[in-house]
Design a protein with these regions (language model features):
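Phosphate/nucleotide-donor binding subsite
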Residues: 49-104, 155-163, 171
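Donor-nucleotide binding loops and adjacent catalytic segments primarily
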Residues: 207-317
Length: 338
């Protein structure tokens, strides 16, 4: 079977589908991955066929987009900003994916792009989505995030309450996306988004561990939990020697914010330098935010990109942004994290 994988975003959006692609290859399927050229090298190093998809951005543009996302006050505003960021290339992206779909037997796509299902239906190609966040999976015995829980109320009342909020959130999300991308969808004969939350596809893969969450008795059968899909970049041998020399057989704290970026970095790092105890070793991964310090402190080790598995074996604990990929790696390593 020929499978097309589609995703966009930061490394946390890209790497899980590389892991999925390798699993599909192991099961003797042919796999191609359509995403931005920024990730072409990593995809091809994994032995997966790369397919071009816009945007053809350099890394600094992606960093600016991540910084804009960090400014959003709530999940709905964040989702709207994601679609707003993609307006300049959304039409080209739809056209590109439309051309690739007909060459494949199955499409597995990031949950951000459920509108590609319309294209798959036109070509009679099965379509599935993949999501990295369990908090957007609706069930009447699970209260949506940020909504008060009715603990202590009869189960029937709780179910009505939760179902109401899931339906409302579903409509708000649909309207929010359509308000941004509706004209582009219309120009490609794609109807407005409907049921982004409740019915994104006939199959929605949730790559989160079931053991970490409440087990819903009313989960729609379209949502299937696979556990985390982890992919690690190659080991950096030169950095390995530096880490061994720096740590001297001791585990040390590690700070990493991955591909998240944010405002006022210089002020934040100045406070960090002022308050971090002298002589206490720590590893600081610069990440997409470009974290750094302004003075020479030999007890603070600044490093660039490296795989979680290589880095976290030196960790006493990890302070991180809570991204799905980083959280999965910390849990895999079995170390404390904040």
């Amino acid at each position: 079977m020929k499978v097309l994988l589609i995703s966009q975003g930061s490394t946390g959006d890209i790497y899980p589908l590389i892991a999925l692609g390798k699993a599909l290859q192991k099961a003797n399927h042919s796999v191609a991955y359509a995403t931005a050229p920024l990730y072409k090298e990593e995809i091809e190093k994994a032995g997966i066929k790369y397919q071009y998809a816009p945007p053809d951005w350099e890394k600094p543009v992606f960093v600016d987009c991540m910084r804009a996302l960090d400014r959003q006050p709530n999940p709905i505003a964040l989702l709207k900003q994601i679609y707003r960021s993609g307006l300049s290339f959304m039409g080209e992206l739809i056209d590109t994916i439309d051309g690739l779909i007909q060459e494949n037997d199955l499409v597995v796509c990031s949950y951000i792009f459920p509108h590609f299902k319309v294209l798959c239906d036109r070509h009679k190609v099965p379509f599935a989505t993949i999501t990295f966040c369990h908090s957007v999976i609706p069930a009447k015995d699970v209260t949506p995030d940020l909504i008060p829980k009715l603990n202590g109320f009869p189960a029937s009342i709780q179910y009505l309450w939760n179902s109401f909020w899931w339906r409302l959130i579903n409509k708000v999300v649909d309207q929010s996306i359509n308000s941004i991308s509706g004209p582009t969808f219309k120009s490609r004969q794609i109807p407005p988004i409907k049921n982004f939350i409740s019915a994104p596809a006939d199959l929605s893969i949730v790559c989160v561990s079931k053991s970490l969450m409440q087990q819903s008795r009313f989960l729609d059968s379209r949502f299937t939990y696979t556990g985390y899909l982890r992919w690690q970049s190659d080991t950096n041998d030169a950095l390995e020697k530096e880490l061994i020399q720096f740590c001297e057989d001791d585990a040390v704290p590690i700070i990493t914010f991955g591909s998240v970026s944010f405002d006022n970095i210089q002020d934040i790092m100045s406070r960090f330098e002022k308050n971090w105890p002298k002589g206490q070793k720590i590893i600081l991964q610069s990440g997409w935010a470009g974290l750094s310090i302004q003075i020479n402190r030999p007890e603070i080790k600044i490093i660039d990109q490296v795989s979680h598995d290589q880095l976290f074996k030196y960790a006493a604990c990890v302070i991180h942004h809570g991204g799905a990929g980083t959280t999965a790696s910390v849990l895999h390593a079995g170390i404390p994290h904040v």
